[in-house]
From Swiss-Prot:
Involved in ribosomal large subunit assembly. May regulate the localization of the 5S RNP/5S ribonucleoprotein particle to the nucleolus. It is found in: Nucleus, Nucleolus. One of its GO terms (biological process) is regulation of signal transduction by p53 class mediator. One of its GO terms (molecular function) is 5S rRNA binding. This is Ribosome biogenesis regulatory protein homolog.
Amino acid sequence: MEGQRVEELLAKAEQEEAEKLQRITVHKELELEFDLGNLLASDRNPPTVLRQAGPSPEAELRALARDNTQLLINQLWRLPTERVEEAVVARLPEPATRLPREKPLPRPRPLTRWQQFARLKGIRPKKKTNLVWDEASGQWRRRWGYKRARDDTKEWLIEVPGSADPMEDQFAKRTQAKKERVAKNELNRLRNLARAHKMQMPSSAGLHPTGHQSKEELGRAMQVAKVSTASVGRFQERLPKEKAPRGSGKKRKFQPLFGDFAAEKKNQLELLRVMNSKKPRLDVTRATNKQMREEDQEEAAKRRKMSQKGKRKGGRQGPSGKRKGGPPGQGEKRKGGLGSKKHSWPSALAGKKKGVPPQGGKRRK
């Protein structure tokens, strides 16, 4: 009995070892292409198993992914390893596949005004050492920055110049001069950025004044300022004789989340019917108004054209300087007097008629 149990245990151990080896060892018709630098494995084998899987190939996909991952891990274990802080690390080779960049290449940094001038004049920068000898402290110190050599800000005594006011605070004057230098450097930096981006910077003299604002612009600005509150100008105080603002926005009314399901279904079906219909939806009122508007425009254009023709016909002059048609101008003689054909006057002025007394006073005998 004991010998039989030992044989069973040995057989079970051999079976487990075989299963482990089977999990590690994967057979492929075509070997995979590996790019260990990018941890990439490309499988060129035809997916015959996936074609035979049917409509649900999830299990086959998992098995295929597991086999390919196992082959990739086997390749990683063949790389040279080293121990770093109680951990085994493998050095990956250089990647062979070029991956596309997520973002474009960075643009070269634009040159400052001094760099442009130095390039134009051929000035080359001279490298200066970071440390210089400080005679006051007797040691090497930084050229710039904190604990620099010849740091005049740490002096407790400042000599007053002969041309300066003896009552002026030289320490405050030095601090103010430093602030001005910092502000000037910042302004130059912003100008360089604006020049690089081709922007227009305001002048040091100040912003240019704006033009005269009309009544409409001031009213529009006042209306925008009034509605720029949390209540959209609803609780804003008004002047005694101020009118209510026009065009105040109306509150949107949304449909309730839980309501008439039949009406909602009807609206959705109507929307789908309109979207699926091949014929365009015709608005009779809008089409009629458009047709009437076009007819009115055509009539107005025709009248305008006729009036222009009449003006040209009555305003042209002949070679002798006389008008062809139209009322006579200054300096022209009327042909035919008062009874001419072109300008007819009342019959009482043109001649006698029976039963009509003559006008213009008594006649002389």
